[in-house]
Protein backbone atom coordinates (compact mmCIF):
# COMPACT_ATOMS: atom_id res chain seq x y z
CA UNK A 1 0.00 0.00 0.00
CA UNK A 2 2.82 2.41 0.87
CA UNK A 3 4.53 1.55 -2.39
CA UNK A 4 1.38 2.34 -4.33
CA UNK A 5 0.95 5.61 -2.42
CA UNK A 6 4.57 6.57 -3.09
CA UNK A 7 4.23 5.70 -6.77
CA UNK A 8 1.06 7.76 -7.17
CA UNK A 9 2.60 10.68 -5.32
CA UNK A 10 5.71 10.53 -7.49
CA UNK A 11 3.63 10.34 -10.67
CA UNK A 12 1.47 13.27 -9.58
CA UNK A 13 4.47 15.38 -8.67
CA UNK A 14 6.28 14.53 -11.91
CA UNK A 15 3.69 16.51 -13.86
CA UNK A 16 3.93 19.59 -11.67
CA UNK A 17 6.52 22.31 -11.64
CA UNK A 18 9.19 21.99 -8.99
CA UNK A 19 7.81 24.91 -7.01
CA UNK A 20 4.25 23.58 -7.19
CA UNK A 21 5.49 20.19 -6.02
CA UNK A 22 7.30 21.78 -3.09
CA UNK A 23 4.28 23.86 -2.14
CA UNK A 24 1.83 20.97 -2.38
CA UNK A 25 3.98 18.57 -0.43
CA UNK A 26 4.76 21.24 2.19
CA UNK A 27 1.04 21.88 2.72
CA UNK A 28 0.54 18.22 3.61
CA UNK A 29 3.83 17.62 5.43
CA UNK A 30 2.49 18.12 8.96
CA UNK A 31 -0.45 15.77 8.50
CA UNK A 32 1.55 12.55 8.88
CA UNK A 33 5.04 11.13 9.19
CA UNK A 34 4.75 9.70 5.67
CA UNK A 35 3.85 13.12 4.26
CA UNK A 36 6.71 14.69 6.19
CA UNK A 37 9.10 12.18 4.62
CA UNK A 38 7.66 12.82 1.15
CA UNK A 39 8.22 16.56 1.57
CA UNK A 40 11.78 16.02 2.80
CA UNK A 41 12.53 13.78 -0.20
CA UNK A 42 11.09 16.30 -2.66
CA UNK A 43 12.99 19.17 -1.05
CA UNK A 44 16.28 17.26 -1.08
CA UNK A 45 15.92 16.52 -4.80
CA UNK A 46 15.52 20.19 -5.72
CA UNK A 47 18.48 21.57 -7.60
CA UNK A 48 17.41 25.21 -7.57
CA UNK A 49 19.26 27.67 -5.40
CA UNK A 50 16.73 30.49 -5.46
CA UNK A 51 15.53 31.90 -2.13
CA UNK A 52 12.15 30.15 -2.09
CA UNK A 53 13.54 26.71 -2.94
CA UNK A 54 16.31 27.19 -0.37
CA UNK A 55 13.73 28.16 2.25
CA UNK A 56 11.73 25.00 1.61
CA UNK A 57 14.95 22.99 1.94
CA UNK A 58 15.62 24.70 5.29
CA UNK A 59 12.07 23.92 6.43
CA UNK A 60 12.61 20.29 5.40
CA UNK A 61 15.69 20.13 7.58
CA UNK A 62 13.71 21.46 10.56
CA UNK A 63 10.86 19.03 9.89
CA UNK A 64 13.28 16.13 9.65
CA UNK A 65 13.89 16.61 13.38
CA UNK A 66 10.31 15.39 13.94
CA UNK A 67 10.94 11.99 12.44
CA UNK A 68 14.53 11.13 13.39
CA UNK A 69 15.86 10.08 16.75
CA UNK A 70 19.38 11.52 16.53
CA UNK A 71 20.73 15.01 15.87
CA UNK A 72 17.33 16.69 16.28
CA UNK A 73 18.79 19.81 17.86
CA UNK A 74 21.42 20.14 15.13
CA UNK A 75 18.81 19.76 12.38
CA UNK A 76 16.57 22.43 13.88
CA UNK A 77 19.47 24.80 14.48
CA UNK A 78 20.88 24.33 10.99
CA UNK A 79 17.50 24.70 9.29
CA UNK A 80 16.49 27.73 11.36
CA UNK A 81 19.85 29.43 10.77
CA UNK A 82 19.52 28.87 7.02
CA UNK A 83 15.93 30.10 6.97
CA UNK A 84 16.81 33.25 8.93
CA UNK A 85 19.72 33.99 6.60
CA UNK A 86 17.54 33.55 3.52
CA UNK A 87 14.90 35.91 4.92
CA UNK A 88 17.53 38.44 5.96
CA UNK A 89 18.80 38.50 2.37
CA UNK A 90 15.26 38.60 0.90
CA UNK A 91 13.21 40.57 3.46
CA UNK A 92 10.40 41.49 1.05
CA UNK A 93 9.55 37.96 -0.11
CA UNK A 94 6.11 37.03 1.25
CA UNK A 95 6.44 33.30 0.58
CA UNK A 96 9.55 33.15 2.76
CA UNK A 97 7.53 34.71 5.58
CA UNK A 98 4.76 32.15 5.08
CA UNK A 99 7.31 29.34 5.34
CA UNK A 100 8.87 30.75 8.51
CA UNK A 101 5.49 31.44 10.11
CA UNK A 102 4.35 27.91 9.33
CA UNK A 103 7.53 26.41 10.80
CA UNK A 104 7.26 28.55 13.92
CA UNK A 105 3.59 27.69 14.42
CA UNK A 106 4.26 23.98 14.22
CA UNK A 107 7.51 23.61 16.12
CA UNK A 108 7.21 22.83 19.84
CA UNK A 109 7.30 26.04 21.89
CA UNK A 110 10.04 24.61 24.11
CA UNK A 111 12.43 24.87 21.14
CA UNK A 112 12.16 28.66 21.35
CA UNK A 113 11.86 29.34 17.63
CA UNK A 114 8.69 31.42 17.56
CA UNK A 115 9.79 35.03 17.89
CA UNK A 116 8.70 36.16 14.41
CA UNK A 117 5.07 35.04 14.36
CA UNK A 118 3.47 38.49 14.79
CA UNK A 119 5.97 40.19 12.50
CA UNK A 120 5.44 37.62 9.73
CA UNK A 121 1.66 37.68 10.13
CA UNK A 122 1.55 41.45 9.67
CA UNK A 123 3.98 41.31 6.74
CA UNK A 124 1.87 38.67 5.00
CA UNK A 125 -1.37 40.62 5.53
CA UNK A 126 0.17 43.94 4.46
CA UNK A 127 1.71 42.53 1.28
CA UNK A 128 -0.93 39.99 0.27
CA UNK A 129 -2.62 42.19 -2.36
CA UNK A 130 0.63 42.53 -4.35
CA UNK A 131 1.13 38.79 -4.88
CA UNK A 132 0.37 36.73 -7.98
CA UNK A 133 -2.86 34.68 -8.03
CA UNK A 134 -1.12 31.33 -7.37
CA UNK A 135 0.69 32.68 -4.32
CA UNK A 136 -2.50 34.35 -3.06
CA UNK A 137 -4.27 30.98 -3.19
CA UNK A 138 -1.37 29.35 -1.34
CA UNK A 139 -1.42 32.07 1.33
CA UNK A 140 -5.20 31.74 1.80
CA UNK A 141 -4.84 27.97 2.27
CA UNK A 142 -2.11 28.54 4.82
CA UNK A 143 -4.10 31.22 6.63
CA UNK A 144 -7.18 28.99 6.85
CA UNK A 145 -5.32 26.56 9.10
CA UNK A 146 -3.04 29.12 10.79
CA UNK A 147 -3.02 29.20 14.58
CA UNK A 148 -1.64 32.75 14.62
CA UNK A 149 -4.21 34.51 12.44
CA UNK A 150 -7.64 35.30 13.84
CA UNK A 151 -10.87 35.12 11.82
CA UNK A 152 -10.81 38.80 10.82
CA UNK A 153 -7.23 38.53 9.60
CA UNK A 154 -8.04 35.39 7.65
CA UNK A 155 -11.04 37.12 6.06
CA UNK A 156 -8.89 40.09 5.02
CA UNK A 157 -7.06 37.75 2.63
CA UNK A 158 -9.74 37.72 -0.05
Give residue spans per PLM region.
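Terminal, low-structured helical/coil segments at or just beyond the last alpha-helical repeat
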Residues: 123-158
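Structural register within alpha-helical repeat arrays
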Residues: 57, 62-64, 100, 138-139, ...
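Bacterial Sec-dependent N-terminal signal peptides
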Residues: 1-21
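Short coil/turn linking the two alpha-helices of tandem helical-hairpin repeats
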Residues: 27-30, 58, 63-70, 106-111, ...
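Helix-turn-helix repeat elements of alpha-solenoid scaffolds
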Residues: 27-41, 72-80, 113-114
Amino acid sequence: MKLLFSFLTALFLFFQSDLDALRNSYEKANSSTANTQIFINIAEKQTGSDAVTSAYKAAAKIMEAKIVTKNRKALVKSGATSLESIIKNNPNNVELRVIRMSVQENIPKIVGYSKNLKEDKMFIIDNYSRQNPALKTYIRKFAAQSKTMNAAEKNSLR
